[in-house]
Amino acid sequence: MGHVPRNLPTLLMIGFEELRIISWNVRGAVHEYGKLFIKELIRSKKPDIVLLYEIRCQFAQVSHYWNSLGFFPAFVSEAIGFSGGIWVMIRTNFGLSTRLIHMHGQAITFELWKDNLSWVCNAIYASPIPEQREILWQHLTQLRESISIPWLLVGDMNEVLQPSEVRGGDFIPSRAHRFASVLDKCRLIDLGLVGGNYMWFRNRNNIIILSKRLDRALGDVDWRLAFPEASVEILTRVHSYHSPLLVHCGGQEHSTVLQRPFRFAWINWIGCVLLQ
């Protein structure tokens, strides 16, 4: 894993302000309902990058579909049967450069740059198996040592931080504490949410019996300083148990009375890790 050079000092990311990233655990990228919903998401939200997880197919099965949407597979970690899979899809006329830093079974790390400005993005699909998820936590902790430019992580963490992030099920303090310790070691904070509190739902007889906040966006101080107006929006849930997330790097065009983006007034690391 090579060292990622640093931009000094941390600057506002001019040229990245309009960047939009959709992140979604799609639970089957070949399903017709899922494909219709993705097409509508791209039409209405106009993302530049689409991160998909739990793919349940090979990219070759849907390559023509994505080409018709104007996206290409920048980085792909294929699913093994119905298990795993991460796709980083980028708009064809993106206008920014990308470089793969590291491919991991539960994470794809890549760099985006324009002119002399760059930052790192991680697409995360944490395993639902705690022992496998621990491998990811160790990987991210090691990765932190090689990254010295702004760092954003987006995806399905398959873990919660607080009791308030679970409704209808058990909160497991030991696992939440381990997740919080990883964020602390990696110097990451939660970027907050607009539009709700939960991203994953389990239904029984069309009644929601369990809700959790498994998906989130995390950034380090450098990333937040570079994107002070950035916000994270929960989108409508269709087809999957997970709601998509939309990261507005430059902030939403129209403010609402919903939660404002996190501001640094700042920073006790342990307190921030536990702050929603």
What does each model-found stretch correspond to?
Residues 1-151, 161, 169-172, 185-186:
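Short phosphate/oxyanion-binding micro-motifs
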Residues 163-167, 259-260:
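Short acidic, glycine/proline-rich loop/turn micro-motifs
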Residues 73-77, 96-98, 202-206, 232-235:
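Short, P/G- and charge-enriched loop/turn segments at secondary-structure junctions
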Residues 75-88, 186-217:
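Active site of divalent-metal-dependent phosphoester/diester hydrolases
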Residues 61, 96-99, 150-155, 186-194, ...:
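Short helix-interrupting loop/turn segments at helix-coil junctions
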Residues 80-85, 130, 197-200, 238-240, ...:
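A short acidic, often aromatic-flanked loop/helix-cap motif at beta-alpha or helix-coil junctions
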Residues 48, 156, 215:
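Conserved acidic residues
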Residues 210-212, 216-217, 221-276:
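Surface polyanion/phosphate-binding segment centered on an Asp-His-Pro turn
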